[in-house]
């Protein structure tokens, strides 16, 4: 073989070795996919680099995601950004617009969600809650007197109103006894009074007659009711009773007048008058339209701020509980090596070819240098 043939032959051999070596090295990143054994011993370089280091790769990828990609700081920064808030507001407004078109009642929506008879449940909850609060108030303030419980300003205003109250009582009494019903009632009272007096009453009835006596008593009664001294007398009586009432503790008032039962009875009447049933019979659309301005301008922004604030403050603990590194590791472990190889080769196919060609070029250069040494020495 001549000098030129030797030179070309060694360049070709070197280039082929370099190209094949690099191509084989690239293939050995992924292949073989599993280990092969010969005489009970594992064949070297099986499985390929990535399949063999798969567990370590999955673990490192999980740590990389947690420590460098999905960090609490990065997510918080994204959550509090103006773009995120604007997007969240837009989504919320779209939801409100959608709800405003709904013909479903609140009751129907809750029943679809699994709550049976929501209006009854709401009334029962309110009743139970108010009972608990009232019992708590009774325990807390049962031994305190009314003057300790009622503010001084309120007591003073009530005391100032006593003359007005007594005047109102007397004026209503005058109007009643001037009416036909009042006159009849007064006549009946006089008749009953005389009957209880036996013979003396019969004698009075004999001389005057019931109607005549009622006609004589009524003007005097009205005169008495219109008298300022009567008003003052009634005011003084009311003030004295008010003064005594202020000294009563709630427990004493309960023993004397059954105050707790009266309060609970009043509570039941109020709750019956203000049942939640009409609210639950409203359609969601009606309620949304009625409060649309408050929902979009006040409640939605405030709710989003609270929601984002709550998420941000608890984000770190939530991410720790999620254990993202384990999730990433599990997903990488389950990901087929064949699919991973296909993805990497499809992305870096051109670069891998260039590496193969570079191996051939370097092998050719080495072959040329070797040919020079062979020819010269």
UniProtKB/Swiss-Prot annotation:
- Gene Ontology cellular-component annotations: plasma membrane
Presence of the UniProt keyword Secreted in the record: no
Membrane topology, from the record: Multi-pass membrane protein
**Keywords for the protein's UniProt record, in alphabetical order:** Cell membrane, Membrane, Transmembrane, Transmembrane helix
Which segments cross the bilayer?
Answer: 1-21, 357-377
Give the subcellular location.
Cell membrane
- Matching InterPro entries: DUF445 (IPR007383), UCP032178 (IPR016991)
Homology family: Belongs to the UPF0754 family.
Q: What is this protein called?
A: UPF0754 membrane protein YheB
Q: Which gene encodes it?
A: yheB
